[in-house]
Amino acid sequence: MEKKKSKFKRVLLILFILILLLLVFDVVSTEIKSKKLPHHFASAEEGRELLLSNTEYYSDFSQNDIDYRLKRNGGTLDELLDATTDEIKDFNFFEKYLLDHNIAKMVTKLNKNGYKLPELKEETVYIKTDMKVEGVNAGYTHGTQIYLNSANILVGSIPGKASEYFEHLMWHELFHCLTRNDPDFRAEMYSLINFTVADHDFEMPPSVSAKYFHNPDVEHHNSYATYNIDGKDTDCFLVWICTEDYSENDPPNGFVTDVALVPIDGSDVYYTMDQASNFDEVMGRNTDYVIDPEECMADNFSAAMQYGIDGEEGKGYPDPEIIQGVIDIVKR
């Protein structure tokens, strides 16, 4: 009996060691493969320093930008930055593994399909934040900094739609880093939805600048498309606006946003999406996220990288030529 117990214990020990070795191998191989898309995970301290380095972005904030994020009237930029940096946390080992696993999966798809992305001048830096100040968004970027909602990192470990959503997010945020890094890549991508990139940013007229709501993923307003408005072709750039000031009395209904189509000729007027009869024709119908060509193409890029030309579950796309265009660009 004692011999049987001893043998059983040895078998359990061997199984435990084998499982442990497999886990170690998986973690190490996943990390090695994921490094094909160069990145690192910021500590909370580094993440806070990086966020505070984005002075140009935050210095242009309006009072409305501050109030909506702090969810109260009369806040200051310093208070906003304090609240935003307080949300930045350290990654734990499991979260790093989950992210490396997703990045390794992205690398596999790039290699399998023969896709080549523009090289980044700096590696991407992933930063973990609770994201409450930024409206509980899933993610956003500055430069090559990718800020991820701490709750969504765990969602990425759930098989099925949840993990697919997280993969989409990872591709989407990476796109913003790529377009900042490579102006030619950005121009090519924007051209797929009929946008031309100019050599300068367009000035927002007073009627628009007063309502402009900052999006960290959109660094420039220097691209335009031709919209048919009241039967006339008008070259416009897009601006995300908040049509109402923040109100503590009615916060849920206070955040009303719209997309302003602003003529590039400098006239102090803007139009809405509904006023452009060809808005869907210009932007395509593959995504509803059309507040800016940057966000629209980030979604198209994500779909192309994640599902290819066949689309999710082989269902295709309303405008497959945009997806094919993305594939052609990264396959050259």
Predicted regions and their residues:
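N-terminal Sec-pathway targeting helices
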Residues: 2-17
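Sec-dependent signal peptide cleavage junction
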Residues: 24-33
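N-terminal mature-domain "stem" immediately C-terminal to a signal peptide or N-terminal signal-anchor/transmembrane
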Residues: 32-100
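Auxiliary, metal-adjacent structural segments of Zn-dependent hydrolase domains
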Residues: 85-148
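Soluble non-cytosolic domains of exported or imported proteins
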Residues: 93-104, 160-165, 169, 288-296
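Active-site scaffold of zinc-dependent metalloenzymes
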Residues: 129-171, 180
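Post-HExxH zinc-binding segment in Zn-dependent metallohydrolases
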Residues: 182-263, 294-332
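Extracellular low-complexity, Gly/Ser/Thr-rich intrinsically disordered linkers
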Residues: 268-309
